[in-house]
Amino acid sequence: MNKAILHTIIVYTLASCPYCIKAKALLDEKNVAYEEIEVSNFTQEEKEKFIKKSGGKKTVPQIFIDNMHVGGCDALFDLEKEGRLDKLLENQPKTTSPAAGA
């Protein structure tokens, strides 16, 4: 069965987290669509699933591209600095409008 995925980039966040805001700003600059999942209201079961999916990490943001765990904000910016982020994002759905401030 072929399952269509609307967003293949998922960012687990907290609204007040400055690293989450920074990571989302970079993705916005790249004009790629992503699904943001706010973790503050997770049940205990959801928290456990999140931690397991994130390889034991309990911090946010946690970023996934095509079901691959990228890591947090620093890891995302490391990919950008190394010139590898654009390659990971090249087949991702684009946003319909340019990034704010562009």
From Swiss-Prot:
PROSITE patterns the record matches: GLUTAREDOXIN_1, GLUTAREDOXIN_2
One example of a Gene Ontology biological process annotation: cellular response to oxidative stress
Keywords assigned: Cytoplasm, Disulfide bond, Electron transport, Redox-active center, Transport
UniProt GO molecular function: glutathione disulfide oxidoreductase activity
Domain Glutaredoxin span(s) in chain numbering: 1-96
Taxonomic superkingdom: Bacteria
Subcellular location: Cytoplasm
Disulfide-linked positions: 17-20
A single Gene Ontology CC term: cytoplasm
Pfam families the record matches: Glutaredoxin
Subunit structure, as described in the record: Monomer.
Physiological role: Has a glutathione-disulfide oxidoreductase activity in the presence of NADPH and glutathione reductase. Reduces low molecular weight disulfides and proteins.
Name of the molecule in the record: Glutaredoxin 1
Organism: Rickettsia conorii (strain ATCC VR-613 / Malish 7)
